[in-house]
A protein has these predicted regions:
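Short, Lys/Arg-enriched N-terminal segments with co-localized hydrophobic residues
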Residues: 1-7
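Long amphipathic alpha-helical segments
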Residues: 8-77
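Short Gly/Ser/Thr- and Asp/Glu-enriched loop/turn motifs at secondary-structure junctions
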Residues: 18-19, 37, 88-92, 300-303
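Glycine-rich phosphate-binding segment of PLP-dependent enzymes
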Residues: 46-47, 51, 90-91, 101-126
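Long amphipathic N-terminal alpha/beta scaffold segment
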Residues: 59-104, 108-111
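Short, flexible active-site-proximal loops enriched in glycine and acidic residues
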Residues: 79-90, 118-130, 149-150
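Conserved PLP-enzyme active-site core in the AAT-like
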Residues: 125-344
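Structural signature of PLP-dependent enzymes
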Residues: 344-360
Length: 360
């Protein structure tokens, strides 16, 4: 047994034959000059490659010098690749969540490109005083939707959170059970409502909710009637949901706020273009919604954003809430959204703007 131990101890560790970091970089510089990477970056990459090889030494035979060199070059080149890459959407799903949702129109990309230097993000150019970054977008949304006021946050889930936090914290929000949706990434509407500080009151059943269900649930603590458009699924057959107009009738004479979460949202009637119909923002407001919220990066075709429109007194409360600053959008998204919304100002040339065309 003593001989056996001596033989095992005398067996050389193959990892000792691995090249040093310095020698590896010298060979790399001579064979594959990569001037775009600093010496420190090359050292870090070489260390990662060698550490990975050492960690797997008990498996397959160790790679030779040339293979190690190729791994190092690949490691460095991967540093130069952006995390987001251009792809061709061959899925058949136009608004694909994992592929970036809507394709931005050329007008939006051109507008963003102009922001190479400083810009009038939050300044009144006439007075030189601080302004509101959403003033331009608000003006466009007022003209397009007929709303009294509007503001923008970074996505529609954020819009839901902000609206309920500003208008319903500590109070009850009534929602149909058939509209308690789950969106991408396992984020559920009841969880968003809980984070807002509002108290969820469920009414009706999964497939059927009647006006009387809302009326019977209203108490002195009720503040919001919330309608949610289930954009990512449909319940068909033996069903009944309460419309925005019916909810508006229910809240008549009561100190309640009707909030309509349209999800994808539409600023034009898609049926006129041979597409499946979706509730429009204008229709929601005409039906009596006090506040409507929807995504800017789906049917509208703009950047990721959550758009909130409605009565001015409620939009002002929403805009002044502390969460509004935490959820606000940056200059690039704001500019791209503004350029996209301008395409909706002329319905007669809407098809020519390309917003209903599919781009690869």
């Amino acid at each position: 047994s003593g001989l056996h131990v001596r033989i095992m101890n005398d067996t050389p560790d193959p990892r000792r034959n691995l090249p040093s970091i310095d020698s590896l970089i010298q060979i790399l510089d001579a064979k594959y000059p990569l001037p775009e990477f600093s010496h420190d970056q090359k050292v870090d990459a070489a260390r990662r490659v060698l550490d990975e090889i050492r960690a797997r030494a008990s498996g397959p035979p160790l790679p030779g010098r040339e293979e190690i060199l190729e791994r190092l070059r690949a490691e460095l080149e991967s540093l130069g690749n952006l995390g987001l890459r251009r792809v061709v959407n061959g899925t058949g799903i136009v608004l694909h969540t994992n592929l970036g949702r809507a394709v931005l129109p050329p007008e939006a990309m051109a507008a963003v490109a102009e922001l190479e230097g400083y810009c009038s993000l939050q300044i009144d150019l006439e007075s030189g005083r601080r302004g509101r970054r959403d003033s331009g977008v608000e003006d466009l949304l007022r003209r397009i939707t007929g709303a009294e006021a509007a503001t923008v946050v970074n996505n529609n889930a954020a819009a839901t959170l902000l609206v309920l936090a500003a208008l319903c914290a500590g109070r009850d929000v009534i929602v149909s059970r058939g509209q308690l949706i789950e969106i991408g990434g396992s984020f559920r509407l009841p969880d968003v409502i809980a984070q807002s500080g509002a108290r969820l009151v469920e009414v009706g059943t999964t497939n059927k909710t009647h006006p009387r269900d809302y009326e019977n649930a209203i108490t002195d603590n009720t503040r919001v009637l919330l309608r949610v458009n289930p954009s990512n699924y449909r319940i068909t057959g033996f069903t009944r949901q309460v419309s925005t107009a019916e909810l508006a009738e229910i809240k008549q004479g009561r100190d309640l706020i009707l909030v309509d979460d349209l999800g994808c949202g539409a600023l034009v009637d898609l049926a006129a273009y041979g597409l499946p119909s979706e509730p429009t923002v204008q229709g929601s407001l005409r039906a009596g919604a006090d506040v409507a919220l929807f995504s800017g990066d789906k049917l509208i075709g703009g950047p990721q954003s959550g758009i909130i429109v409605g009565r001015r007194k409620y939009i002002d409360l929403i805009r002044r809430h502390p969460l509004a600053r935490a959820l606000r959008v940056g200059k690039f998204a704001m500019t791209a959204l503004e350029a996209t919304l301008k395409l909706f100002l002329n319905p007669e040339t809407f098809r020519e703007t390309g917003r209903l065309n599919v781009h690869s």
